[in-house]
């Protein structure tokens, strides 16, 4: 699933969703320009809440009642993990969604299911997942049971539904026989709710007419909301899906139909579509959709049918064409990368109007937010285009790694999502070879997640399976550690093995475990096998020994270099060095570290730092004017610190001839010094000194690292006297960059060609406007005024729209806000709507922001999938932050009920609204908020709340210790 997804990855609307660590370097400068570049973290993966069921759509006709919700651990149905007594082999599922409400105003679906399973251990009960389903009586019971292949089924004594653990329990009068097969039939009805989970409905307007479709989101634990099933990833089976649907609509599922749809004998206006049997697969990868969508399609040379589906108006305007163009090359790339053909005969990808994740890798039928699949050359920015190709690559990577070979349990989710988050850059780079996408993983994944992983409240990539049980616990695993740290350490592993060797090991892993389940050690073993079958690459330790230190303990090291002696030392890096690390590590927070380096521009031999606190090697010893720089291209997941003299020589090199240091490492110098200063390892003035060369810099990555790093200063000081001198300094530094792009674009009439140039143009304009460059304000006013004169013909180049919209709203009043609101309400282009919706949060008028906050409670105004993002946008505004905080406190119960348990984005809301907290009063407020809402709970935001408390304390301390030095530095350097 995409984050970003998931992550995501990734994928993007708001800078604020990246602001997840108190003294991080990844908070984007403003709500505008990061929209064009970063992955939409709030659209990362989710699963549905586990609260009590909604009102039943039908009255049950069952002989037994729902079980009490108190758990007695001696009873197997009170354990969240399924017993190993029964193993499914196949399902036959028929579903009929009703896309008009019933007499009670509810949308419902009816279904029937037959599951075949084998008894592996003698048992007198069947425990199967079921959630919010009402069963129709079959011979006096909720289900019927029969033997297969000559076995006799025991009689059913009673059945019960256990709400807390989401089980249907069938008590039998006699035990099932070991190695015998059985089939269980059921008929049921459920609500086709708009809750974005399980089998749900999505609504949209086409040509002024309301339309309803039925779709699915099963990951992680919501297939059970659609039909009774053994809903764990290791419980693989085949599935025969049949959909009964209105004859004017199209039915889709993981597989192609067996043949044409046929009329439903009971009602001629309905059709029946029966799909081919799936391969052996996990329940969370199932998908089925009923809609009036249209498609564009093509066949690959290997005869795989590719189809892109979306609303008819979007397809008629060609918005699916870019996705179709890149899907074939990406599938071809991964087939060769994995040395394994694409496992299915078709690849459907569909853009949904309502979808809580960024995308979901359902096998053969990938579902997306519209913004992650559709691209309009007339209104979409380069960031929108990058999002489409990277999210497609992420989801198609899963078709092998995740779908063909699947994790045993959710505690190893990091391997599934981290792998896809790494290779998405490789697949997208193949589809767009001129974009240099592989470099952007450093900014989008490595630096983003370091901000979280440097907290004492972080967690290891891999946890014991026993620590991940409930749906809420599973949901918490879908975080930036799993996605971005997973990607970062796998990239590091691929780098020191070499990509070719890494690919050989992965191919062997996929060939061995096709249609099976694995744990992360299985991958290590196959990489070790690949290593052992060649002699060119030698490691001083096994893959297992190296990598376990990176995945079984949280955090990462800072490597400190003393260039006078050549000594290297390592230490667990914490943004707050006084924070209390309560999680023990059997490796004592020491790592085996791959070290690459250059000395005065010349690359040196590779070096392995053992898991010792201190070592010495002359590679890192300098004399005279020599300087040394570690972690080339930031392939290693660690920070680097140097003695003061070496830092000074690096800064001198940057200010005299910056081209000697690679672009990525110019970004690294800025990023690392700011993180080190945050942790009080180096003076804050050293970090600020690393930005002095920027008046000569025109490359994207160093500027992005600087703006992200300085955005923390903005958060801490935009309510204090420091902000004035800070604005003056940044205005001085960015003016040459603004002038550079003004020149190369012929006064903004042309556009840069490369991806990173376009991103840096966005940086230049956004930063110049934020910090008061007069020509930028004039540019914004002129472009916005031209648009208002003719709203049907927007003259603003898509890359600059977020910046122009936001600044126009900030400079204007009610009239400007209402104009943008009307454009938002009327546009059918999702990427344009996202830009407008974010910009509406830029108002500087309190009453307008409060009105906008109230709109988030009305799904007619703001879609449910966009509520968290909208609240986060408002919170990113220095004026809106306190308003959003008050609103969230007042509406916590409703927000929690709607988003709290299953939404990855919910944690981002807590992070966004608290990221400016830097006073004792705000800390007290946060602690009181926690105390006041213990009964309601915090769901998937629980860990984020603890991190917010930790970050607030760190912010208070940092501001107290650094405010005067920062104020003095900006005053001295802003002239």
Curated annotation (Swiss-Prot):
What GO CC annotations are associated with the protein? cytoplasm; extracellular space; plasma membrane
Note on how the cofactor is bound: Binds 1 zinc ion per subunit.
Name of protein = Aminopeptidase N
Superkingdom of this protein's organism: Eukaryota
Q: How does it assemble?
A: (Microbial infection) Interacts with CCoV spike glycoprotein. Homodimer. Interacts with SLC6A19.
Q: Where is this region: Cytosolic Ser/Thr-rich junction?
A: 33-74
EC assignment: the record states: 3.4.11.2
Q: List the disulfide bonds.
A: 769-776, 806-842
Record membrane topology: Single-pass type II membrane protein
Domain notes per entry: Amino acids 1-191 are essential to mediate susceptibility to infection with CCV (in canine/human chimeric studies).
Per the UniProt topology annotation, the Cytoplasmic ranges are: 1-11
User: Site annotated as Transition state stabilizer: where?
Assistant: 483
Q: What is its main location?
A: membrane
Briefly state the modifications made to the protein after translation: Sulfated. N- and O-glycosylated.
Residues annotated as the enzyme's active site:
395 (proton acceptor)
Carrying Sulfotyrosine, the residues are 182, 425, 430
Organism ancestry: Eukaryota, Metazoa, Chordata, Craniata, Vertebrata
The function of this protein is: Broad specificity aminopeptidase which plays a role in the final digestion of peptides generated from hydrolysis of proteins by gastric and pancreatic proteases. Also involved in the processing of various peptides including peptide hormones, such as angiotensin III and IV, neuropeptides, and chemokines. May also be involved the cleavage of peptides bound to major histocompatibility complex class II molecules of antigen presenting cells. May have a role in angiogenesis and promote cholesterol crystallization.
Q: Which PANTHER family match?
A: AMINOPEPTIDASE N (PTHR11533:SF172), PROTEASE M1 ZINC METALLOPROTEASE (PTHR11533)
Region annotated Disordered, chain positions: 41-68
Q: Which organism is it from?
A: Canis lupus familiaris
What is its cofactor?
Zn(2+)
The UniProt record gives the binding positions of Zn(2+) as 394, 398, 417
Sites carrying sugar chains? 134, 240, 271, 533, 580, 633, 689, 747, 826
Q: Which residues cross the membrane?
A: 12-32
State which ranges are Extracellular (membrane side).
33-975
Residues reported to bind substrate = 358-362
